[in-house]
Amino acid sequence: MRAERMSPLLALGLLVSGLCSRVHCLPENVTPEERHKGTSVDGHSLASSNTDFAFSLYKQLALKNPNKNVIFSPLSISIALAFLSLGARGPTVTEILEGLKFNLTETLEREIHQGFQHLLQMLSRPSNELQLSVGNTMFVQEQLKLLDKFREDALALYTSEAFSTNFKDPETAKSLINDYVKNKTRGKIVDLFKDLDPLTKVILVNYIYFKAQWRTPFDPKQTYKSQFHVSKNKTVEVPMMSIGDLVTPYFRDEELDCTLVELTYTSNDSALFILPDEGKMQDLEAKLIPEMLTRWRESLYPRGIHELNLPRFSIATDYKLKDILSQLEIKKVFTQEADLSGITDDHELEVSQVVHKAVLDVGEEGTEGAAATGVKVGITSINNHIPLSFNRPFLIAIVLKDTQSIIFLGKVTNPSQA
């Protein structure tokens, strides 16, 4: 009987690394106009669903990891699960796509995949202002034959490579996959998989590497040691970056008791830093919805900031998402009821785990050999008496401008913890 079998396993590995640094790199061949043109309404609809999924997943991760740093890439997870859904059928595919916050009564499944195809094409455009690598890869057990339709769609829609792998030798397979991942993320992600089950048949990997430079850099000489208030009873010493007389998008949200500042990169992408008032973090987290992000973006307006203080930090996280995704109603794919018959003729395939590893560095360090120039804008006609210090837990969202995709989302509770 099906209930008594030992299920062949499919694992998803999700990995992402990002660095936010200070060097102003001048474009050589690609103009901002060339990079940004082509964004469609469909792309914004996709971004809306991805944002809804991002906030839902964030709430679960924050709930499961109280008083800890939370950093993940909703974009990476969305792409990987959408990729997986290519091979899902029946209630399994419905759960995955609805869990990703798509309305299947309004949007055809094929249109969703075409939306991700367009998104990946946008992300793959070359730029001298931004280092961004996104890819999908399949590691397939030797002798296992993928269905032609799945292989073709995986390549056409998700530009996925496929590598034959001997999972019956789990140590060798693990080294192969981890080395591949390490190479694709410039050494930032190591040991994505700690161990592999010899019953594994397929591993789907999505990776994202992101590195950008601040449009207006921080001066390392201005970085100083300062106290960060992790909680009422705990403070830690952190390197605090500082910049004065800065003009940047700013918004004071009296309704949600928080302050926002947006720092842009030379690529016009941006990092949104959200500082709740003392004791208001949980209230803010409970109200995270896509409409709130839209309201924030519409309300941000350039203001003069007398002094901005932001901790320099490097945070790494490692999550197993099976239980958390189940809370978002993505369940069947992890059980013997999974229908992944669109991947292979082996109809007893199921997902064993979704592993996500993220690394995010925010600092003033630059790229070796690049030009290190940043331009400050004069603010004589703008109120420049606003001081802002991120010296207690705050939220961060890194948004790609041309697709409105959240590439990173998280909470910095303790910048001193790697």
UniProtKB/Swiss-Prot annotation:
Protein name, per record: Serpin A3-8
Main location, first listed in the record: cytoplasm
GO cellular component annotations of the record: chromaffin granule; cytoplasmic vesicle; extracellular space
Provide the GO MF annotations for this entry: serine-type endopeptidase inhibitor activity
Domain of life according to the entry: Eukaryota
> Mind listing the UniProt keywords for this protein, alphabetically?
Cytoplasmic vesicle, Glycoprotein, Protease inhibitor, Secreted, Serine protease inhibitor, Signal
Q: Which family does it belong to?
A: Belongs to the serpin family.
